[in-house]
């Protein structure tokens, strides 16, 4: 069975679009590890990856990924109307719709996700640093927040599951 045969068509498309934009599941798993390692000393990257995969299986997450990436690509291609074109190109701080889309992911596993998201959005470790680099000419206004939100949701899922096994 190929990698994509194990996923729904939507999930496979969302994963493929992230990969096209330079984001691997392992990148997001590293963010989960960054968020959770001090709370779970025996945590492994495999556990983090499992939780990322579970988050990616959610339809609302797939919808957010596909929508956000499409808007980022259209902004790169300069196919949006003003003032939206400029707001996305410069990642206008008062725009906020990118965060609203990310919150739809963060909220899946409860309020702990918001704390995780706020922290990782501020620190911008790993892949988030690259996605926020405006010098590349790429637009990741939505994708950086979506990746942060997926890591926050996966961290929340991990925390909830760990709590029930103690």
From Swiss-Prot:
SUPFAM superfamilies: YutG-like (SSF101307)
GO BP: any one term: lipid metabolic process
GO molecular function: phosphatidylglycerophosphatase activity
CDD domains according to UniProt: PgpA (cd06971)
Residue spans crossing the bilayer: none
Pfam families from the UniProt entry: PgpA
Family, as annotated: To B.subtilis YpjQ.
Protein name (record): Uncharacterized protein YutG
